[in-house]
């Protein structure tokens, strides 16, 4: 059922994209500007850094990343996008995975994708897929349960697929994050951590060419079962100057409740001249060709109780709240 849901969400981004007629119309001047752009002049490698504060199942992090065109044609591009992030400890008393504090780690993410423009360049469509990893170091808990001396590291991984459609007014993004390998691991004597399957659809509107507001729906599911259910999210992003984008996010689901996070992305390179970079910044449909794909984190949650105590380094099962031997 979940796999069918993910396929449906991915198809919806392409199916819904042609609906907004206002973005299709455009003025003759707008169409002339976009048709005159040579993609080989503006679709160039970019590299830089990014950072984010913790959200629903995602860590405090900062790192480097880059977008690398593999092949650029008149109206399309094949690309590779890669990220490496260092993770930092959770805010005191505020676990990013619900109960256990994340003490650090790092992550990697790669996406291979294809993006193309329609005939009059009023829409950009894209498909990408990739692989993400997330080793985790753990600390204490926010629940008062003493786990000192039993903290463990864990390693989670996932495959991801994404479909996108962008005009100069609207953007649609559908995605599926699917954990693979050992998706459920012990974090300490009491809590287990699990990577979440996540399937979502975001719909955004460009208030201006550099300000985008979006809302989204997601469904999450994990082997532990404690975080299963639906959620909603909102995002406001502002490209302050070419290559520098800041965003604020708010999400809600029953497991993580309300989470507010923020992120910053800086990229250097891109279009050949300053004038071209400014022109591209005012045309979201062209700017999207070199944008970094979203939804790159392996989302993790935890759960505890008598049902998980048997995995206790060979010790006897413990009652809820008991300390280790």
Place the predicted regions along the sequence by residue:
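Detector for outer-membrane/organellar transmembrane beta-barrel domains
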Residues: 148-224
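Extracellular loop and loop/strand-boundary signature of outer-membrane beta-barrel proteins
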Residues: 50-53, 88-100, 140-151, 184-193, ...
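Flexible, glycine-rich linker and terminal segments associated
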Residues: 24-35, 185-195, 200, 205, ...
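Transmembrane beta-strands of outer-membrane beta-barrel pores
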Residues: 51-57, 70, 84-90, 116, ...
């Amino acid at each position: 059922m979940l796999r069918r849901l993910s396929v449906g969400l991915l198809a919806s981004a392409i199916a819904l994209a042609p609906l907004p007629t206002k973005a299709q119309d455009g003025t003759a001047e707008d169409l002339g500007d976009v048709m005159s752009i040579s993609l080989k002049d503006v679709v160039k490698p970019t590299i830089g850094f990014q950072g984010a504060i913790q959200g629903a199942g995602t860590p405090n992090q900062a790192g480097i990343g880059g977008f690398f065109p593999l092949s650029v044609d008149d109206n399309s591009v094949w690309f590779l996008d890669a990220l490496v992030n260092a993770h930092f400890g959770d805010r005191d008393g505020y676990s990013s995975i619900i109960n256990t504090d994340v003490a650090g780690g790092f992550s990697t993410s790669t996406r291979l994708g294809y993006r193309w423009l329609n005939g009059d360049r009023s829409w950009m469509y894209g498909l990408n897929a990739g692989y993400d990893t997330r080793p985790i170091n753990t600390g204490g808990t926010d629940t008062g349960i003493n786990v000192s001396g039993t903290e463990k590291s864990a390693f989670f991984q996932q495959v991801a697929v994404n479909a996108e459609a962008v005009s100069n007014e609207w953007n649609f993004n559908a995605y599926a994050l699917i954990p693979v390998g050992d998706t459920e691991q012990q974090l300490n004597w009491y809590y287990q951590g699990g990577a979440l399957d996540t399937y979502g659809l975001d719909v955004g509107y460009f208030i201006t060419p550099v300000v985008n507001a979006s809302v989204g729906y997601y469904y999450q599911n994990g082997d532990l079962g404690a975080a299963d259910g639906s959620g909603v999210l909102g995002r406001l992003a502002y490209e302050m100057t070419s290559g520098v984008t800041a965003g604020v996010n708010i999400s809600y689901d029953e497991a993580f409740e309300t989470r507010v996070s923020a992120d910053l992305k800086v990229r250097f390179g891109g279009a050949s001249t300053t004038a071209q970079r400014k022109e591209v910044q005012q045309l979201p449909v062209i700017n999207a060709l070199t944008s970094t794909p979203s939804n790159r984190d392996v989302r993790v949650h935890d759960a505890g109780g008598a049902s998980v105590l048997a995995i206790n380094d060979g010790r006897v099962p413990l009652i809820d709240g008991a300390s280790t031997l």
